[in-house]
């Protein structure tokens, strides 16, 4: 019923420009807790997204959809008539920018779209912008984006990558397999005309296909990302790929005997025994950085394939439909006998590789990659924060990776990604201090998108039991 009401209302609304304030339908307005012409958040602890140390007792002024003042509470005047919200004891951060998001739930017997639950969960946990890194139902995602942007569906601003593009034997029933450069150019051109702004490649395409896809996408103003295998990271970087997914674990540069245009069977496993400090690995990092290809960290989803670390978060399990929950619980119980197993040493090497990539000047973002191991939108993004801190980044650096760096990768950093005057008021208000206590990051109270504050608990309540259904 909720799906029908929200989508029916959205169809009557015009598509509005990204980051403009939309007129909210009653179905969306019921999730809103703050919606005033001028809002003052006072006495906040502020992590601004730039990587600089957190500042205490700060005031943020929001006028319409934008931030108009940021500074110490003692010296930042609150405009007359503003709705003033004392957020002492809370931390304000930029809205997160996710770079590996999905609105379908896979890895279980019945793949389903998260047409309502996905946007609700993403927004409830502070993700205000997300790039869908591959779609099973691309037209559903395009329509979903239109509904969100028009104010008919609560959720983040989405950038759509269209369907998965691949090569060789089918690895995904809903991917488009490509064997020639000409065919690739035609398909990329088509999805550009349909509204995709990114293109996502999977792991079996040839170098010629990937090169053609990158060239055609760039000629049309689109960017390209990939979960690669048959083409190595350094090969793709040399072609000008914009964004490489998952980092060390998927980089087939490190597979001995790798054959051109072939995805080696041991990829994502042999990396566990690769010396991450070796000259070859260091050289590959330098090549990726020199070619200005960014990387997406997805540490959290791979942790769910680790028998010694994986856990089912009770908060996430509440959002699963009962039959889907049983499947996820069964998968978890039998994890050690499953397919992909990530040993602890591999996760540690993934973390080390990401630190070295950033130290070398690389641009690192982050994304969720929801999956049937119980790794869900929003809450999975926040697990990445904890793991980035565990990896050795400061809390402020981890926030930067998940916010401003993501905005830079998307080309939106002039508008979003940090808490600064003139930027869009995309913010998350968190109870506690996630700098001192990383687990506090889950205590999201209010999420501002385009200057409108959404009640996180109301959003989460509406998503309970929905993943696996809608």
Where are these regions (language model features)?
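Acidic, glycine-enriched loop/beta-strand segments at the rims
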Residues: 28-33, 46-59, 72-73, 376-379, ...
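Divalent metal-dependent hydrolysis catalytic cores, especially in the metallo-beta-lactamase
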Residues: 118-139, 155-163, 193-205, 214, ...
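Metal-associated gating/positioning segment near the N- to mid-region
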Residues: 90-152, 171, 176, 182, ...
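Divalent metal-coordination and catalytic microenvironments
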Residues: 44, 60, 65, 89, ...
